[in-house]
Design a protein with these regions (language model features):
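Short cysteine clusters
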Residues: 49-56
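Short, acidic/polar
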Residues: 134-140
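N-terminal [4Fe-4S]-dependent radical SAM core
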Residues: 1-45, 60-68, 83, 87-91
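Core AdoMet radical
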Residues: 57-77, 84-106, 117-134, 145-164
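Generic structural signal for well-ordered alpha-helices
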Residues: 78-82, 110-113, 139
Length: 164
């Protein structure tokens, strides 16, 4: 059985990042915009995770390692995404939304997708997800916003091997 952590407990140690913080969103690995040197940019809007998988490479929901979670203001994040696209001479055709946690826990995920999809030359938007927060309604909203593909992280179909 999967162990799903209440989002409220995650929000208790939240650090909001917006224009007033002056925190750059290019260059960090856990938040913001990540350029892997191709036509794809990774976008990480928050660090929330609703799971506590023992094998997680980022230990996203471990209080022993991560005392705080981060959530980036949507408009501030979009400014940095557009700047990264500009710095790459508008040669970005794909945005992949992922996280060191669970991207669908970001409260404005559909709006993020819609606005990213409207950036010049961005043809395809994808997202990584553990799938546990997806409902039929949410999937339809993400698709309507312009999401082209959800890459589900399925660790095992057998509870014996899946360590939540």
């Amino acid at each position: 059985m999967q162990q799903i952590i209440a989002k409220q407990s995650v929000k208790n140690s939240l650090i909001s990042i917006d224009r007033t913080t002056n925190i750059p969103l290019i260059g960090a690995i856990h938040i913001g915009v990540i350029d892997r040197g191709s036509n794809l940019l990774q976008v990480r809007a928050s660090t929330y995770c609703n799971m506590k998988c023992s094998f997680c490479s980022t230990a996203a929901n471990s209080r022993e390692i991560h005392n705080y979670n981060y959530e980036i203001d949507l408009d501030y994040l979009l400014d940095w995404i557009k700047e990264a696209v500009r710095l790459k001479n508008d040669e970005v055709s794909q945005i992949n939304i992922d996280s060191v946690g669970e991207p669908t826990a970001y409260p404005r995920i559909a709006e993020l997708i819609r606005k990213v999809k409207s950036i010049q030359n961005v043809e395809f938007v994808t997202m990584q997800s553990n799938g546990t927060l997806l409902t039929e309604e949410k999937i339809k909203a993400l698709e309507s916003a312009g999401l082209g593909r959800i890459n589900l992280s399925l660790h095992s179909l057998d509870d014996k091997f899946s360590k939540y």
